[in-house]
């Protein structure tokens, strides 16, 4: 039987494991941590947090793939009464509706935007500087970057367009992303995949067939001894907060003065926190010279405006900095094709959200994982033809 080793048991690693196992491959997954999921882990109670604000977009190929296999978990529905509590922060105040120019800019597709020009310059030429700033700030929800306007116009526009489309693409697994990971892991085991947790791999295994490295780029660079495995990513403060419930709190605050996003996840999924409490997760991008305190102060200013008495209502909070863990960002003149290649040669393949694969957020991990399995099995067995029509 064909053999494949996968290092990393996050969303990308499990996607690769399932794809290979469906093709009749003997798969072993090594996960260094005690639990699977990587950045898709959900904390155990009482506060079932993800690693920062997370959503599962329905417009990418991963959605169809998961749905066809019955792997999509139950999804949390947002009540209409909560949906109308979406707020934007603009010119120092909270408002119910974003400026019309944001929607006009967001309607443009990624293909209309240039690769070689930064987003701010391109959008300013079309809609004026004010709209360009607002649109760049809003796109931060899918970028986790402090200055989206400096990035490639096509890269930013794709995310802006996807993040604002109607009906919304963003969906929320009930109970957190960990529910999706658990379903994927269960199916993988049913297909015969051997999953070894607390199994740290410090050197590439030899003689066991192709190897797929499904780790963050810094870990992959150390494992492969290749310092060139780098690509720019965001740097953001993650701010988690549990409050005693108060009727009328916003569902979302999107900062249009500077990239920042606060979301009350219990609005659609009360199971994420104990009864009588609300769980908020926020991300506040910070520049290379800014500190965690700067991001926390940003969050607190927004909370002061939107969540009256939040300090007195706080029952739990947590803050951290996420650096290089939020997916690739592309500078002007570059696209996803310029990122580290999936095929590293000699039967080694690299997958994840920082590699050369298309898509938004988790879609990059998915697409690279399917591509890596296709390449690995094609190279390992020239006569083998992997049917990826369902992927």
Regions from the PLM with identified roles:
Residues 158-204:
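Helical element adjacent to the flavin cofactor pocket in flavoenzyme catalytic cores
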Residues 2-29, 373:
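N-terminal Rossmann-like FAD-binding beta1-loop-alpha1 element of flavoenzymes
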Residues 21-44:
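Glycine-rich FAD pyrophosphate-binding loop
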Residues 199-292, 339, 388-391:
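Mid-domain catalytic core of redox enzymes
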Residues 265, 271-391:
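Conserved flavin/dinucleotide-binding core of flavoenzymes
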Residues 63-86, 128-136, 233:
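A short alpha-helix-loop-beta-strand transition element characteristic
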């Amino acid at each position: 039987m064909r053999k494949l080793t996968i290092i990393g048991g996050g969303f990308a690693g499990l996607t690769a494991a399932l794809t290979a196992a469906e093709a009749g491959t003997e798969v072993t997954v090594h996960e260094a941590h005690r639990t699977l999921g990587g950045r898709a882990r959900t904390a155990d109670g009482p506060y079932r947090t993800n690693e920062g604000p997370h959503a599962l977009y329905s417009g990418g190929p991963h959605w169809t793939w998961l749905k066809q296999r019955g792997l999509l978990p139950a999804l949390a529905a947002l009540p209409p009464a909560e949906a109308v509590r979406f707020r934007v922060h603009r010119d120092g105040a909270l408002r119910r509706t974003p400026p019309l120019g944001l929607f006009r800019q967001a309607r443009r597709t990624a293909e209309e935007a240039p690769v070689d020009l930064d987003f701010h310059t391109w959008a300013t030429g079309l809609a004026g500087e004010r709209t360009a700033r607002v649109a760049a700030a809003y796109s931060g929800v899918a970028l986790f970057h402090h200055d989206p306007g400096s990035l490639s116009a096509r890269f930013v526009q794709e995310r802006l367009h996807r993040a604002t489309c109607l009906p919304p693409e963003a969906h929320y697994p009930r109970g957190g992303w960990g529910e999706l990971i658990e379903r994927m892991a269960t199916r993988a085991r049913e297909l015969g995949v051997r999953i070894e947790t607390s199994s740290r791999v410090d050197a590439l295994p030899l003689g066991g067939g192709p190897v797929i490295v499904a780790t963050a780029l810094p870990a992959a660079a150390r494992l492969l001894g290749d310092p060139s495995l780098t690509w720019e990513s965001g740097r953001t403060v993650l701010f988690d907060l549990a409050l005693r419930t108060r009727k009328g709190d916003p569902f979302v605050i999107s900062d249009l003065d500077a990239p920042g996003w606060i979301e009350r996840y219990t609005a659609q999924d009360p199971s994420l926190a104990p009864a009588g409490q609300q769980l908020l997760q926020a991300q506040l991008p910070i520049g290379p010279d800014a500190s965690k305190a700067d991001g926390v102060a940003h969050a607190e200013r927004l909370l002061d405006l939107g969540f009256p008495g939040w300090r007195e209502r706080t029952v739990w909070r947590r803050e951290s900095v996420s650096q290089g863990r939020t997916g690739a960002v592309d500078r002007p003149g570059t696209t996803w094709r310029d990122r580290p290649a999936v095929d590293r040669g000699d039967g080694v393949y690299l997958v994840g959200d920082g590699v050369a694969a298309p898509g938004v957020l988790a879609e990059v991990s998915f697409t690279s994982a399917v591509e890596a399995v296709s390449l690995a099995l094609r190279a390992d067995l020239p006569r083998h033809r992997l049917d990826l029509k369902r992927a």
